[in-house]
Amino acid sequence: MNNIVHKLKTLVLNEAFGGVLLIVCTLLALLVQNGSFSEHYREFLNLKVGFSVGEFELNKPFLLWINDGLISIFFFAIGLELKKEFLHGDFKNPKNIVLPFMAALGGILIPAMLFALVNIGDAYTLKGWAIPTATDTAFALAILMMCGKHIPSSLKIFLLSLAIFDDVGAILIIAIFYTTKLSIVAFVVAGLAILAMLILNLLGITRKSFYFICSVILWISVLKSGVHATLAGIVTAFFIPMQTKNGEAFLEEIYESLKFWIAFIILPLFAFANAGVNLSNIDIGAIFSGVSIGIFLGLFVGKQVGVFLFSYLAIRFKFAALPQGSNLKQLYGVCILTGIGFTMSLFIDGLAYEVSDIFNYADNLAILIASFCSGIWGFIYLKFFTTRS
């Protein structure tokens, strides 16, 4: 029995399984939204959930609890991984940072430029310039794992490293470009919560409950401040100690304990809540609008071109080297997979257009189509057109 449980847990934590689960949740959301349960689906997402303490009240639709709350946990895990890599991992050596950093930079600049070129002159549609800059790491990794043993493991490490910088880019974009009216009082409370975590860290205190309380206060204050609440997750991660006073791995333990919940609950639930595009509301004109074309070109063309071009230049001018055991063809195949924006692109789309249906959901459909095309083409290319090395 224990062996079965262990195998199930291993399966769930496998990146490929996580990607397959996201695909299932995406298809399920599309079926439910366009079937007889569509009304229940919308009621579920719009269900108000909250609490009040005295004059303070926090009452939000369930969809916002997912997008602002659960995704903060995902960004918290990204922050933990980033801190771990910089202090004790591959990023401790500056040479290992150059290639994924340049790749991520190209994967942000080129898609954004393509989107802007298509939508130039329209201030409202230009708000979505960051939509095609994101990559859904779980999906991309899942497809890479399915491509066969001739793909070296170094490319998986490259994709994971690229994803970290890609997520940092997304965090900065959200913080700088997608904030609303700011609240000074909320910022003061957030600052006090950060100060408390800094003191806990400097004193070497590793009581999880203390950090949890501070992180909740920080999350609520950031939510009320006008800055997107997911930033609370990444900030909290930076103050988590690497180890206890006894030398036990504290940060690693927290990171490992979150993997199951992120892979099995948070990301699938996010996909189910955000991928429900109502196909009956989409018209041909909306599909060929500047926003839809910009998203498709940015994700399917811009991502692979930008990531590969900047990677090639870094290698060509000897700022970086190819991942061990790989060749340029295989590297390009991985670059194609970065066009799978899916959950992260849907997330930024919701911030850019404030979950509006002004484009008749054609923007969401463009994200799904571009992600699907990137995934299929990336798989075919890596599986059948790359040479063994």
Curated annotation (Swiss-Prot):
HAMAP family: NhaA (MF_01844)
Family designation: Belongs to the NhaA Na(+)/H(+) (TC 2.A.33) antiporter family.
Any single biological process term in GO: regulation of pH
Compartments where located: Cell inner membrane
InterPro entries membership: Na/H_antiporter_dom_sf, NhaA
Chief localization: membrane
Protein encoded by which gene: nhaA1
Keywords linked to the UniProt accession: Antiport, Cell inner membrane, Cell membrane, Ion transport, Membrane, Sodium, Sodium transport, Transmembrane, Transmembrane helix, Transport
Protein name: Na(+)/H(+) antiporter NhaA 1
Entries under PANTHER family matching the protein: NA(+)_H(+) ANTIPORTER NHAA, SODIUM ION/PROTON ANTIPORTER NHAA-RELATED
Gene3D superfamilies referenced in this protein's UniProt entry, alphabetically: Na+/H+ antiporter like domain (1.20.1530.10)
Molecular functions (GO terms): sodium:proton antiporter activity
Annotated catalysed reactions: Na(+)(in) + 2 H(+)(out) = Na(+)(out) + 2 H(+)(in)
Organism of this sequence: Campylobacter jejuni (strain RM1221)
Topology versus the membrane: Multi-pass membrane protein
